[in-house]
Amino acid sequence: MNPNQKIITIGSISIAIGIISLILQIGNIISIWASHSIQTGSQNHTGICNQRIITYENSTWVNQTYVNINNTNVVAGKDKTSMTLAGNSSLCPIRGWAIYTKDNSIRIGSKGDVFVIREPFISCSHLECRTFFLTQGALLNDKHSNGTVKDRSPYRALMSCPLGEAPSPYNSRFESVAWSASACHDGLGWLTIGISGPDNGAVAVLKYNGIITETIKSWKKRILRTQESECVCMNGSCFTIMTDGPSNGAASYRIFKIEKGRVTKSIELDAPNYHYEECSCYPDTGTVMCVCRDNWHGSNRPWVSFNQNLDYQIGYICSGVFGDNPRPKDGEGSCNPVTVDGADGVKGFSYRYGNGVWIGRTKSNRLRKGFEMIWDPNGWTDTDSDFSMKQDIVAMTDWSGYSGSFVQHPELTGLDCMRPCFWVELVRGLPRENTTIWTSGSSISFCGVNSDTANWSWPDGAELPFTIDK
């Protein structure tokens, strides 16, 4: 073979090898593309961790979590059929209260994006519990937090976030424009009640599964307001209480029965010497029990209980262990309003067990500071101040605020009874801490257990002032 032939042969072999290599590379690219397409399919999931997809169809909640690991989608599915919450169970027997959640939102908000809020509360479906709150349309440590001590403004909204998490724009769900609110789940969907508008013409907007279903106009034109805690659902019906009228005298109080977001019945309480505001309600053996705030003239708490036909009974907690703030020192109680230090008040709660009562209250008689739970074995009906158990929740030196009840249904817990729980708002900032320009709060929650519990203090713990305050 002469030199020219050798050169031609070597060149031909090189070209052939190059073509084969190119074909292999093209095949490799096609293979990678096809493999990726098969993995992602029509779902078109991005690489976001813990993306939650909730689909509602044929009365079944399908809850799936997609976790992307090395381009491989692992799907953990859990189907839970919707069910109407019966609400017929009695309260679980308990010996004390176990710490359930603490969101530390003020501490986190000094550096992170956390909403300025007040009036947080908790409500549970048969699948989950959520924290609801009234935001001020502002973030902590930001200029729009200035002046958020104001209760009613067009910037306030009811929102919710996963239980125990600090409420932020990244984990919160909008529910309703509102400066007074309530929410509850009937086993099929969320009912939300959001009140907004001027003092002399506010309107309550009812939503069911996020869709407006009805409105209720202020009937006295004097600051229509509702519970600031969960409403109660039983056998497909949900119940709430609203107040319209003076905060320092006799007002108008109505109970509403609501089905799938629509009012099916309402009554006005005949209670001329009573004052009901910001009621904390819970189901117990097929009835609804509400323990409320008397802002007019009672340092003990008024109550109203009613059945599903709205037949009702009213009274005041008789115990000499007084539950409101401000209040006198414990002493002789009354089954009528205890008028000593009876003006003003704070949202609170109690749980009735026969003739006994668990009373939640601030430790201070004058300031919204500290919190404790007291068991008075005869306090629902007797007027003495004897009690048999006290559990410390927040120390006297630390700020508290509103408190309220919520329950966990047997459909959630698997128990054969209704688990009683409560939350406490830990308010910081104005008007008491005047080194700040804002008012907001974090929250803690506890649930009743028939086992050992701890006495301690779980305060807010944020160091004030913030950068925006200086």
From Swiss-Prot:
Intervals, Intravirion compartment: 1-6
Cystines in this chain: 92-417, 124-129, 184-231, 233-238, 279-292, 281-290, 318-335, 421-447
Entry cofactors: Ca(2+)
Segments crossing the lipid bilayer: 7-27
Stretch list, region Head of neuraminidase: 91-470
PTM section of the record: N-glycosylated.
Regulation: Inhibited by the neuraminidase inhibitors zanamivir (Relenza) and oseltamivir (Tamiflu). These drugs interfere with the release of progeny virus from infected cells and are effective against all influenza strains. Resistance to neuraminidase inhibitors is quite rare.
Binding positions (Ca(2+)): 294, 298, 324
GO molecular function, one term: exo-alpha-sialidase activity
Matches recorded under SUPFAM superfamilies: Sialidases (SSF50939)
UniProtKB keywords: Calcium, Disulfide bond, Glycoprotein, Glycosidase, Host cell membrane, Host membrane, Hydrolase, Membrane, Metal-binding, Signal-anchor, Transmembrane, Transmembrane helix, Virion
Signal sequence extent: none
Bilayer topology annotation: Single-pass type II membrane protein
Chemical reaction(s) catalysed: Hydrolysis of alpha-(2->3)-, alpha-(2->6)-, alpha-(2->8)- glycosidic linkages of terminal sialic acid residues in oligosaccharides, glycoproteins, glycolipids, colominic acid and synthetic substrates
Cellular compartments annotated: Virion membrane; Host apical cell membrane
Active-site residues per Swiss-Prot or TrEMBL entry: 151, 402
Virion surface side: 28-470
Protein purpose: Catalyzes the removal of terminal sialic acid residues from viral and cellular glycoconjugates. Cleaves off the terminal sialic acids on the glycosylated HA during virus budding to facilitate virus release. Additionally helps virus spread through the circulation by further removing sialic acids from the cell surface. These cleavages prevent self-aggregation and ensure the efficient spread of the progeny virus from cell to cell. Otherwise, infection would be limited to one round of replication.
Domain text: Intact N-terminus is essential for virion morphogenesis. Possesses two apical sorting signals, one in the ectodomain, which is likely to be a glycan, and the other in the transmembrane domain. The transmembrane domain also plays a role in lipid raft association.
Quaternary organization: Homotetramer.
Extra remark beyond the main annotation: The influenza A genome consist of 8 RNA segments. Genetic variation of hemagglutinin and/or neuraminidase genes results in the emergence of new influenza strains. The mechanism of variation can be the result of point mutations or the result of genetic reassortment between segments of two different strains.
Family note: Belongs to the glycosyl hydrolase 34 family.
Protein name: Neuraminidase
Species, as recorded: Influenza A virus (strain A/USA:Memphis/10/1996 H1N1)
